[in-house]
Amino acid sequence: MKNILSLILLLLSVSVFGQKIPVMQKKSTGKEIHIDVYSAFQKKAPMLKASQFVEDIEFVPLETTDDCILDEFINKIVVTKDYIFAHDYNSCYRFDRKGKFLNKIGAKGNGPGEYTKAMSISIDTINKWVYMSDNWQHKLVKYDYSGKHLGDIKHKISDARNIYLYKPSQLLVESMFYHFAKKGERFCFNFYSEKENRVLSRMSCDYPLIPKKMVSVAPIAYNYKGDLRVKDFWCDTIYRVVDPYHLESHVIIDRGKFERYKTDNKALTTGKLDPRHRMVLGISRIEETDRYILMVSRQGGIVHDKKTGTTHTGGINDNRSCVMEDLYGSPGIRSDHFPSCVQGNEYYTFRHAYEFMEEGNGKHTVTDARYDAFRKMVKGLKADDNPVFMIVKLKK
């Protein structure tokens, strides 16, 4: 009798709590953009030059105050019509588009409205909400633009890190350790509904030969024209999110003889290239504009021109820069922040104030009043000032 009762309870729990979460269906459109990165890297330049794809750059020093001192590494920049949001793992800082500091959002701690560590942010521009992902406590912490705490959203995604807004109250949540799961149970993204407080669907990882020696792997998501684009860490296809249940192929990356990672990329911590990864492609960031698809990889930076069908590549220098800024001669674009945030035909990044002072007068092609304004800006910087925000205006 005891065994029968246990079986009934088990069946009830499966029917109530064990309902299968749908897997997002992938569809091939036959209209994919093909990017032959292997052939492009056979003609790799020492570094990409900004003048190859950049029209102009606007430099905006972010205001430094006693309440606003950003950390050395800015994890994420989000730009809206009126504001700049900068997230440095400790907090989120809101500036106006001219760099004036407005307010801080969020605080570390264990109390109400606090987080242990905010791994990522996502901005809802319609409702003016800010989400922070605290994967230590398995929750999203929600604020308004002024920093007022609006509530905590508990979830059961144990390895959640980066979050991406799909539509108001619908978020795509990245998984960091899905490669440790069994074959057929590896899901790199979870589509989460705040209103329903549940995962609506999941994106599967179909690559069969995943090594478990790696600590974590990170899938990629970015927004283009209001649509999310996603790429699994191991897959060479970028998909467009049609709805929470369907994906359409958008870009196919032809890796040629380039390999996939078999062990962790220790260069991220040591700063030295691992000889075992000499032939690893390892794409870590992707963004897209009307004309360009921008990527950075273990091999260097990639700029694919959708208009001409050409692909330019360049290496990464000792200062971790992958794009030489030859318009104004500024410190260049960091490989760990290229590309990071794109809106329309603008790409947003930053360099620290002290880097502008250390760089001196670099080679530049802009010689008019814009360059004079740039030099005046540099002379007004102090070494311990907050970073300089860069609005990179791409060619159309």
Predicted segments, located by residue:
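Blade-loop segments of beta-propeller domains
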Residues: E63-N75, R94, K100-N127, D134-N135
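Short beta-strand elements that form the blades of beta-propeller/WD-repeat-like
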Residues: P22, H34-D36, Y83-D88, K128-D134, ...
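Asp-box/WD-like beta-propeller blade repeats and closely related beta-sheet repeat scaffolds
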Residues: T116-A118, S133-R186, L200-I210
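Blade/loop signatures of beta-propeller domains
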Residues: K20-P61
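Repeated scaffold domains used in trafficking and secretory/extracellular systems
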Residues: E72-K76, T116-I121, S158-Y166, P211-P219, ...
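Short coil/turn segments at the loop-to-beta-strand junctions that recur within blades
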Residues: D66, G106-E114, K154-R161, C205-I210, ...
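Conserved blade-ending motifs and adjacent loop-strand segments that build the rim/top face
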Residues: H250-P275, T308-G344, M357
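Bacterial Sec-dependent N-terminal signal peptides
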Residues: M1-K31, I77, W129
